[in-house]
Amino acid sequence: MERTPDGRRLLVSRQIDAPPELVWDLFVDTRQWPRWGPSITAVECSERRIREGTTGRVRTVGGLRVSFVVTACEDCRWTWRVAGIPATGHRVETTEGGCRAVFEIPLLAAPYAAVCERALRSLDALAMERSRGD
């Protein structure tokens, strides 16, 4: 648990042996979200790479479409509101030999940690694939 700019959050993280810029690009590129996000099957967005103010809709595994707005996107950290509710934050921290990808989960959404762990495994695999040039 950690205090973030958005309040106390549960952190789920993973060390990834890839350049932080590459992992950050996977986080902000909406075309990649369905590849690493297990709860997202499609994204409709005002732009490919998010920034503060970006809006769109994600389609979930159950087919539900929910709107989102990116509330902050700077210094390798972005946050959003999904269906008007503050949702998981995303950040990348530089480490020796790579980076650490982190999800900041609102305390009321603690069960979502399992989904975030799965997302981090997928993100790691995708980053490794990109690093090798596959």
Report residues per predicted region.
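Hydrophobic ligand-binding cavity/cleft-lining segments
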Residues: M1-S46
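Short secondary-structure boundary/capping segments
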Residues: E2-T4, R48, V70, R91-E93
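Well-ordered beta-strand positions in beta-sheet-rich domains
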Residues: L11-Q15, R65-S67, G89, V102, ...
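Short beta-strand-to-loop capping motifs
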Residues: R14-A18, T60, I105-L107
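Glycine-rich portal/gate segments that line the openings of hydrophobic small-molecule binding cavities
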Residues: P34-R35, E44-A87, G98-R100, L107
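Beta-strand/loop substructures that line and gate deep hydrophobic ligand-binding cavities in soluble
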Residues: R77-D134
